[in-house]
Design a protein with these regions (language model features):
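Active-site microenvironment of metallo-dependent hydrolases
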Residues: 1-19, 24, 345-431
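Glycine-enriched alpha-helix->loop->beta-strand junction motifs that scaffold or abut catalytic
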Residues: 215-220, 251-254, 270-279, 300-305, ...
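Active-site gating loops and adjacent loop-to-helix segments of metal-dependent hydrolytic enzymes
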Residues: 62-95, 121-125, 152-173, 229-253, ...
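His/Asp/Glu-enriched, well-ordered alpha-helical/loop segment
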Residues: 247-254, 296-377, 391, 401
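Histidine/acidic-residue-rich catalytic or RNA/ligand-binding cores of hydrolases
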Residues: 229-241, 267-272, 289-298, 313-329
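Metal-coordinating catalytic core of metallo-dependent amide/deamination hydrolases
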Residues: 124-260
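Alpha-helical scaffold segments that flank or form the walls of functional sites
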Residues: 65-142, 174-189, 423-431
Length: 431
């Protein structure tokens, strides 16, 4: 048992002063408003529920600051990403992912949904999968491994299926049965669990979705959806339906559509009516020039929203939640597209729910995952407590608790100099 004492904490959306949080075996068992005791672990500043990173590709972090020289497009960026994927071994993947997950913790993330499609099972068996699971445990972050089905190279402009290119072979299990066999052999460690993903309608034929749904019943299921207009055009050419309509049988509270940038009104109604989640990744969607998706429209239709760092060009949960609001302001010319509480919910409880965890809330029975933020930095000084997350950055995170254990203390991670770890891991992959 551990007792934490928060100077102030967000409970049920309300900033509450002087809160003692008692946890047993990683679960919050009691909340009381009381003065601090000598035996309490003090959490200064404002304590938020743990922040959820709903969508990540850890190895993409190696490309940060390396893709801007010639502009290019999403599709040319993808070729650079393939080049990194081709160089990874289980050992180098473990080193890189450990450092990336440590960076996420320093930024305040407590759980990550790792959208994992680098398998290469014919060469490594489950070693690449095991490396990611072990990296999360090494860093101390909670993780849902979204084990991804990826069976073909994409679609032509006319909608015809394309075979896997040589650089995509490492992503594929060859068949749904091959994916299911490998998936069943995975052994998640403590604080990790398995989810599943369809990479996209480009990479998996819709004829397989019913069997995939049966194989993954009860697990969180994610898919990239309508990130680029070309995907919509290809799907319409191939099947006469949008990606969301093709995925209709998978929609529901356990399903998350990642990006959802270019959606029709029918798509919005389908996602909202099924109570699906849509995971927006504002910093990546800016970086890759994807566009700005209809987040407020989805929320109004009944969908939940979550947030992710995706390619990890930026790892800052506060920038993602700000981006959800600020990007819509630019598109609509209106402020207040979301309330501060709605933004925090997307970054916490709704993100946890989309990854299959009972967390993202400071409440009895919830996982004891907490993020403490300084209220006195040059960025947060003077900010209203109930809007602090709209002023803070990752740099303002002081303490992070996962499963009742402190994993970031005073802005420091147990692995040491995370910047140096990242530099070494990236050099190992790129040079």
């Amino acid at each position: 048992m551990t007792t934490f004492w928060a100077e102030s904490a967000v409970i049920n959306g309300v900033v509450t002063p002087s809160v003692r949080i008692t946890e047993v075996d990683g679960v919050i068992t009691e909340l009381t408003s009381t003065p601090v005791r000598e035996t309490d672990r003090v959490l200064p500043g404002l304590v938020l529920p743990g922040l959820a990173n709903g969508h990540s590709h850890a190895f993409h972090r190696a490309l940060r600051g390396r893709t801007h020289g010639d502009g290019g497009t999403f599709w040319t960026w993808r070729e650079q990403m393939y080049s990194v994927a081709a160089r990874l071994t289980p050992e180098s993947y473990y080193d890189l992912a450990s450092a990336v997950f440590a960076e996420m913790l320093l930024a305040g993330y407590t759980v990550v949904g790792e959208f994992h499609y680098l398998h290469d099972a014919s060469v490594y068996g489950t070693a690449l999968d095991d490396a990611v699971l072990a990296a999360a445990a090494n860093a101390g972050i909670r993780m849902t491994l979204l084990d991804t089905l990826y069976l073909r190279g994409g679609l032509s402009a006319a909608g015809g299926p394309l075979p896997l290119a040589p650089e995509q072979q490492r992503f594929s299990d060859g068949s749904l049965a091959g994916w299911a066999t490998r998936h069943a052999s995975l052994s998640p460690a403590r604080n990790t669990r398995l989810g599943a993903a369809i990479h996209s309608v480009r990479a998996v034929d819709p004829d397989l979705y019913a069997d995939f749904r049966t194989l993954t019943a009860g697990a969180p299921v994610h898919a990239h959806v309508s990130e680029q207009p070309a995907e919509n055009a290809q799907a319409l050419a191939a099947w006469g339906r949008t990606p969301v309509r093709l995925l209709e049988q998978l929609l529901g509270p356990d399903f998350t559509a990642v990006h959802g940038t270019h959606l029709s009104e029918d798509d919005i109604e389908l996602l909202g009516g099924s109570a699906s989640t849509v995971c927006f990744c504002p910093t990546t969607e800016r970086d890759l020039a994807d566009g700005v998706g209809p987040a407020s429209g989805l929320l109004a239709a009944g969908a939940a929203l979550s947030l992710g760092s995706d390619q990890n060009a930026v790892i800052d949960p506060f920038e993602e939640l700000r981006g959800l609001e600020m990007d819509e302001r630019l598109v609509t010319g209106e402020r207040g597209r979301f309330s501060p509480g709605q933004l925090l919910s997307a970054a916490t409880a709704d993100g946890y729910r989309s990854l299959g965890w009972n967390g993202g809330a400071i409440a009895v029975g919830a996982l004891c995952d907490l993020t403490a933020v300084s209220t006195s930095s040059v960025r947060t000084a003077g900010a209203a407590a109930d809007q602090l997350w709209l002023a803070a950055t990752a740099t303002d995170v002081t303490t992070v608790v996962v499963n009742g254990a402190v994993v970031v203390d005073g802005g420091r991670h147990p692995l040491g100099d995370v910047g140096a770890l990242l530099a070494r891991a990236i050099e190992e992959v790129l040079l």
